[in-house]
From Swiss-Prot:
The gene is rsmF. It comes from Shewanella piezotolerans (strain WP3 / JCM 13877). SUPFAM superfamilies: S-adenosyl-L-methionine-dependent methyltransferases. HAMAP family: 16SrRNA_methyltr_F. The lineage of its organism: Bacteria, Pseudomonadati, Pseudomonadota, Gammaproteobacteria, Alteromonadales. Signal peptide: none annotated. This is Ribosomal RNA small subunit methyltransferase F. Its EC number is 2.1.1.178.
């Protein structure tokens, strides 16, 4: 049962639109959320995913604002995070409302465009991986996370979902306006907030709500939206979102930006973003999603266009030195391209982004070179392979992100054995094939060494699971 702080109730009454009632808000906020997932179209189409999961007792109800998002019901209770399909990155467990900001950020017309996109507060990665899918793994996506512990989680999800066009940073996002002034075509600021809209997931979210705490959060939000706007190119678009419900964390923060840059800020009306969007649309054109409108978490989404350039206040910082990578030589590029093609049938999307560091070969997003020296990056693109005395050894994250036509397809039971870190015994002995990719549902799971009578497991130890969720046979 949700716990409502009376101070919060008194405050939120003032912000609740006149056509909505407090009783419905409390009623819906006390209900559990409908489980929802987003299909990862970097690996599988929604059509094929539904075809794969329907025989396993999944039922799908489309989420109107995300073309690959679904509310789901299962015939039997299964731990979704431990299913084969989740572990191999076919879907992301994501609350329906949180799929709104990326949808608002990148319209269908912008899908696959070669552009620079910034996600200022990325972890754990639901919106980042959704943006990457909307970009079709093209262009450059900079994903920033301030919390050191959450950067690791962010990278794990990016790797699992097969994201290849991403560069990770670890900064207080207030620095982007200074270090990346007018660089990005699109910016998402899913701002830290009081989390009022998450009460359906966390019944204690409002137990200790205090308006004095909110005032401090608002100051941070204003500084962040200012930084986001400075990092945006003229003509670029910014989406500001929170899972808060009050005007002071939402409309007022957007109004602050408009007052600060009156000639450069234009609010974009989102009333036609999806069928029914008008039900949550404010007079400014923002989406203020209350739990009772779509039976979801509470959320706020605003889209802002930068109609003209602004004056740079701080001088351009000095160029960062000691970039630890160097462009691969033509010889090294030819060798790694040949290795991947001959061994696995993998054809790289581009050879322009191949860099080396010590005995490592990396594939950077093709347009990343323009950002070298602007700031320090935690991780760029993906590691393709380690250089051995003779040849290379492919990395797991590369196998997950790059399509291979030459795989050994595993059964349900074999895929579970593989994800638990065990070797797979073959029914009959054949000629050893060496390094080979194994797949499930036509999507890569990882690398094995084919020894003729068994497949030796090469799954990274930190990805090995003690238990894989199983569906009981009906």
């Amino acid at each position: 049962m949700a716990h409502f702080n009376q101070n919060f109730i008194n405050s939120i009454k003032q912000d609740l639109p006149s056509h909505l009632c407090m009783e419905d808000f409390i009623s819906y906020s006390s209900k559990p959320l409908r489980p929802s997932i987003r299909v990862n179209t970097l690996k599988i189409s929604s059509k094929n995913f539904i075809k794969l999961m329907t025989p396993k007792g999944w039922h799908f109800d489309p989420i109107p604002w995300c073309e690959n998002g679904y509310w789901i019901k299962l015939d039997q209770e299964v731990q979704l995070g431990n299913t084969i399909e989740h572990l191999q990155g076919l879907f992301y467990i994501q609350e329906a409302s949180s799929m709104l900001p990326p949808t608002a950020l990148l319209s269908v017309e912008q899908h696959d465009a070669q552009q620079y996109v910034l996600d200022m507060a990325s972890a754990p990665g639901s919106k980042t991986t959704q943006i990457a899918a909307l970009m079709g793994n093209k262009g450059l996506l900079v994903a920033n996370e301030y919390s050191a512990s959450r950067v690791k989680v962010l990278h794990a999800n990016i790797a699992r979902m097969g994201v290849a066009n991403c560069a990770l940073t670890h900064f207080d996002a207030r620095v982007f306006g200074e270090y990346m002034f007018e660089i990005f075509d699109s910016v998402l600021l899913d701002a830290p907030c009081s989390g009022e809209g998450t009460i359906r997931k966390d019944p204690d979210a409002l137990k200790n709500w205090d308006n004095n705490d909110v005032k401090g959060i608002v100051d941070t939000q204003k500084a962040l939206i200012d930084s986001a706007f400075q990092s945006l190119k003229a003509g670029g678009e910014l989406v500001y979102s929170t899972c808060a419900l009050s005007r002071q964390e939402n409309q007022n923060v957007c109004d602050y930006l408009k007052q600060r840059y009156p000639d450069a800020v234009e609010f974009i009306n989102l009333s036609s973003l999806f069928p029914g969007a008008d039900k949550s649309c404010t007079e400014e054109g923002f989406l203020h999603v209350w739990p009772q409108i779509y039976d979801s978490e509470g959320f706020f989404v605003a889209k802002i266009k930068k109609v003209s350039s602004i004056e740079r206040v701080l001088p351009e910082p000095k160029k960062q030195k000691n970039f630890p990578f160097e462009k691969a030589s033509a010889k090294k590029i030819a060798e790694i391209v040949e290795y991947l093609k001959t061994s696995f049938g993998i054809v790289l999307p581009s050879e322009n982004g191949i860099y080396v560091r010590d005995a490592e070969v990396w594939l950077f997003p093709e347009d990343f070179h323009k950002l070298i020296g602007k700031m320090r990056f935690q991780r760029i693109g993906m590691k393709l392979a380690d250089v051995l005395k003779k040849g290379f050894k492919v990395k797991h994250e590369a196998v997950l992100a790059l399509t291979s036509p030459n795989t050994i397809e595993l059964t349900d039971d074999e895929a579970q054995v593989f994800l638990m870190g065990r070797d797979i015994t073959l029914s009959e002995k054949v000629k050893p094939q060496g390094e080979t990719i194994v797949s499930y549902a036509g999507v890569s799971l990882g690398v094995v060494k084919h020894l003729g009578n068994k497949l030796k497991n090469n799954l990274p130890r930190d990805l090995v699971k003690d238990k894989i969720a199983r569906y009981e046979q009906s």
